[in-house]
A protein has these predicted regions:
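Acidic, gly/ser/pro-rich intrinsically disordered tails
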Residues: 1-5, 9, 16-26, 37-43, ...
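Short secondary-structure capping/turn segments at boundaries of alpha-helices and beta-strands
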Residues: 14-17, 57
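Extreme N-terminal targeting and regulatory segments of eukaryotic proteins
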Residues: 46, 50-55, 66-73, 79, ...
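Short nucleic-acid-contacting surface segments enriched for D/E, G, S/T with interspersed K/R
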Residues: 55-70, 155-170
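Flexible glycine-rich surface loops and low-complexity tracts that mediate binding to linear polymers
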Residues: 65-79, 167-180
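Generic beta-strand structural signal
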Residues: 66, 83-85, 106, 131
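Short, structured interface segments
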Residues: 74-100
């Protein structure tokens, strides 16, 4: 599971529509795009699906081409090998001038499994001890499983049994995004790490392994 609390600014690409939830409550839904430039100079235009309180009347305000800022809970998952970002907000969405910069910033809550490569300890250029590792979250798509990878950097190294290859962890930290060869890369600057105690459903999902 990858859940983030974020604020994002971008341009609406598909005008808002009124929809109805399973509970019979009305809400509006639209998509927006936020471009990211990677360290390698490549660019990724990332689309974000946004859902917010509203109805057909308020949906008319959110037309394609308008620049907006929205804050809420962002869910990240894979489907058919593509990364999807879905934002749910309960707060007012701001309309912005064209000069307002694109952005997507916030915090990440991650639950998943550390890769078989385990933990890498190293020193920064200034000689400060650090750690890096990769971990994945799995989502079931029909009969198949999809895996979303996150790269973590830990500035306060931990040497515990639960922080090792193939261990399940819950990580909280700052969401960081990069682009490599035109593909979005998920990164996180760690604030806290703890062992993840799986329930039966989560365990069934987590036991699946990426090829």
């Amino acid at each position: 599971m990858i859940k983030c609390n974020v604020t994002t600014c971008g341009v609406i690409t598909s005008s808002a529509e009124e929809k109805t939830s399973k509970e019979g409550e009305k809400f509006i839904s639209f998509s927006m795009v936020v471009p990211f430039e990677g360290k390698d100079g490549t660019v990724k235009e990332q689309y974000i699906s946004v859902s917010a309180p509203g109805d057909a009347q308020s949906a008319a305000n959110y037309s394609a081409g308008r620049r907006v800022t929205a804050s809420g809970v962002l869910y990240i998952r894979k489907h058919d090998s593509s990364t999807y970002l879905n934002l749910r907000t309960d707060t007012n969405i701001e309309f912005n001038e064209s000069t307002t910069p694109d952005r997507l910033v916030g915090s990440m809550e991650f639950k998943g499994k550390i890769s078989k490569k385990g933990i890498k300890d190293f020193n920064s250029k200034k000689g400060k001890p650090m750690q890096s590792f990769s971990a994945f979250s799995s989502d079931k798509n029909g009969e198949n499983y999809e895996f979303t990878w996150v790269s973590f950097i830990n500035l306060s190294p931990i040497h515990e049994e639960y922080l090792a290859a193939d261990k399940y962890v819950e990580v909280h930290g700052d969401l960081q995004l990069d682009v490599f060869k035109g593909e979005l890369q998920l990164e996180c600057k760690v604030k806290s790490i703890a062992p993840w105690e799986l329930n039966k459903t989560a365990e069934a999902n987590a036991e699946q392994q990426p090829s």
